A protein has these predicted regions:
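Basic- and aromatic-enriched surface patches that contact anionic nucleotides/nucleic acids
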Residues: 1-14, 23-37, 41-124
Length: 124
């Protein structure tokens, strides 16, 4: 039986885990990136409006002894994570605005958005 934990993660923490590679895409689970800008824009609009989106599934981290960090893999949610990173890196616009065009208050609300994450323990 697969063990799992459901938790809520602030979008800022998810972004930081992706940037620092504490959370990585695993080709074993993930298909190639297929979302076009329109899909990414619609998804980011969901976050900006404060609507929920489906959980992101990750596998519990393996330990990188050299870096002394735990590295988790995205099982389901690569397209969404890629869209989030692309938006905060100003790779596409939503409603004719890049992320950097948002006011400080809008950015804070975006970063505080809570993401539902299901962490799977696939080693048991």
């Amino acid at each position: 039986m697969i063990q799992y934990q459901v938790r809520s993660v602030q979008l800022l923490n998810l972004i930081n885990d992706l940037i620092s590679e504490k959370l990585v895409s695993d080709p074993f689970y993930q298909r190639n990136l297929v979302w076009r800008d329109l899909h990414k824009q619609d998804f980011i609009q969901t976050i900006l409006l404060g609507f929920p989106f489906p959980q992101i599934f990750i596998s519990k981290g393996k330990i990188d002894l050299e870096k002394r960090i735990s590295i988790a893999s995205i099982v389901d949610g690569q397209q969404r994570c890629n869209a989030i990173l692309g938006y905060v890196n100003n790779q596409f616009q939503v409603n004719n605005h890049f992320f950097d065009d948002l006011s400080p208050d809008e950015k804070a609300v975006f970063f505080k958005y809570e993401v539902a994450v299901i962490e799977l323990d696939l080693d048991h």
